[in-house]
């Protein structure tokens, strides 16, 4: 089937969906290409980003975070965006696109709840009906975001099938869309899934890297040595990387969740430890067992708890243009606390994975180095999770001290 845009990134990507969804994907691709070439669409999108969401976001030089005087660590402050994370960028773009296509209803999936909140706010703003699928486990661990979504008029549907996490919410959302695409738009939350979603999401997130490039040149007079972002599905990372891909002097570093350790079954690092397979409408690295069944991914952060990754990240890894590392729960937790104590900024646990790796890089540096970390979201949603963990750790320490 002919497409207007290339559905593949190297060998990854594609449109592996039931035939019934092909017309919906074709319609979406055509509408996207048309909108990208329409100055009035771009003007409305830019206006919403500026006057509703609060772009451009700040680029903050940390004062106390870097463990090495040779290393400057800047934070791209997507946590300051309306809605609390980078998710708002592309949600506004897709919601405008849905209205342009005459859709009345939005279907979405969410893990940490940030994409759900962003979708709910865009639907409230633009007068669209909103339905959000969320794994039952995530509904429990992200109750503040569930309340926010419902407050803004969204219907939140807990998904109890499978592992009751993000991948199951994705499956249910896709199932719903296949029965209702004539009136509904599936507002996918990450740079993954069938074509044209990975391309649409990248283009509606690329202002992260564009702003970063302009801001760092203004502040430092040069490009950074590396840009670092956490990777679940990969939307915040591809938004940061997109404008730097053609700058060979800039290292692109994605940080996957190592969970309890890469050598344990409890992690979410398909790029480093997955096998290529077909999942969620795309060909991409995937966490699979010996029989080829999809393994449950694991991370302390609900937003990184995804067993696959966007196809462009897979291609960037395969070609060597980007490198993908990992950070454990404990490392992310330490970085979460360190940023709060050293800079007065509470990051999302997702973003804390990228911070953890940046701190490692800084410790090892032997020459002047300029790092930019994409602080993809704020940590309000995670404070109860972190409080519980720290309380348990303290209780364990006290117990071992009494033995």
From Swiss-Prot:
It catalyses: (1S,2R)-1-C-(indol-3-yl)glycerol 3-phosphate + L-serine = D-glyceraldehyde 3-phosphate + L-tryptophan + H2O. It is an enzyme of class 4 (lyase). Belongs to the TrpB family. One of its GO terms (cellular component) is cytoplasm. InterPro entries: Trp_synth_b_CS, Trp_synth_beta, Trp_synth_beta/beta-like, TrpB-like_PALP, TrpB-like_PALP_sf. PROSITE patterns: TRP_SYNTHASE_BETA. Coiled coil: none annotated. It comes from Shewanella loihica (strain ATCC BAA-1088 / PV-4). The gene is trpB. Its cofactor is pyridoxal 5'-phosphate. Pathway: Amino-acid biosynthesis; L-tryptophan biosynthesis; L-tryptophan from chorismate: step 5/5. Its EC number is 4.2.1.20. Keywords: Amino-acid biosynthesis, Aromatic amino acid biosynthesis, Lyase, Pyridoxal phosphate, Tryptophan biosynthesis. Gene3D superfamilies: 3.40.50.1100. The beta subunit is responsible for the synthesis of L-tryptophan from indole and L-serine. The modification N6-(pyridoxal phosphate)lysine is found at residue 87. GO terms for molecular function: tryptophan synthase activity. This is Tryptophan synthase beta chain. Tetramer of two alpha and two beta chains.
């Amino acid at each position: 089937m002919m497409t207007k845009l290339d559905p593949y990134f190297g060998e990854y990507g594609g449109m592996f969906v039931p035939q019934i969804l092909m017309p919906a994907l074709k319609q979406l691709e055509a509408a996207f290409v048309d909108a990208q070439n329409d100055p009035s669409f771009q003007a409305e999108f830019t206006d919403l980003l500026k006057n509703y969401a609060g772009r451009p976001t700040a680029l903050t030089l940390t004062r106390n975070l870097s463990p090495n005087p040779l290393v400057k660590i800047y934070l791209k402050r997507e946590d300051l965006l309306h809605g609390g994370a980078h998710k708002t960028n592309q949600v506004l773009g897709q919601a405008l696109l849905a209205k342009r296509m005459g859709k009345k209803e939005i279907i979405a999936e969410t893990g940490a709840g940030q994409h759900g909140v962003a979708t709910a706010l865009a639907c409230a703003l633009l007068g669209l009906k909103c339905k959000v699928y969320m794994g039952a486990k995530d509904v429990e661990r992200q109750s503040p975001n569930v309340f926010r979504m419902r407050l803004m008029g969204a219907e939140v549907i807990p998904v109890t099938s499978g592992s009751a996490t993000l991948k199951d919410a994705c499956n249910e959302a896709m199932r719903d869309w296949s029965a209702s695409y004539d009136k509904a738009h599936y507002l996918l939350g990450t740079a993954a899934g069938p074509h044209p979603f990975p391309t649409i999401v990248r283009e509606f997130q690329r202002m992260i890297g564009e702003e970063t490039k302009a801001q760092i040149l203004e502040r430092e007079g040069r490009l950074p040595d590396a840009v670092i972002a956490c990777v679940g599905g990969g939307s915040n990372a591809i938004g940061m990387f997109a404008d730097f891909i053609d700058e060979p002097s800039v290292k692109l570093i994605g940080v996957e969740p190592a969970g309890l350790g890469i050598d344990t079954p409890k992690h979410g690092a398909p790029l480093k430890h997955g096998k290529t397979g077909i999942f969620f409408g795309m060909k991409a690295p995937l966490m699979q067992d010996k029989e080829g069944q999809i393994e449950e991914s694991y991370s302390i952060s609900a937003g990184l708890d995804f067993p696959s990754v966007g196809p462009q990240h897979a291609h960037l890894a395969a070609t060597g243009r980007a490198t993908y590392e990992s950070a454990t729960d404990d490392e992310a937790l330490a970085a979460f606390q360190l940023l709060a104590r050293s800079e007065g900024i509470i990051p999302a646990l997702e973003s804390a994975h990228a911070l953890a790796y940046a701190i490692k890089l800084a410790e090892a540096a032997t020459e002047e180095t300029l790092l930019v970390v994409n602080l993809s979201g704020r940590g309000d949603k995670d404070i109860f999770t972190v409080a519980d963990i720290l309380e348990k750790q303290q209780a364990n320490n006290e117990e071992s001290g009494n033995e």
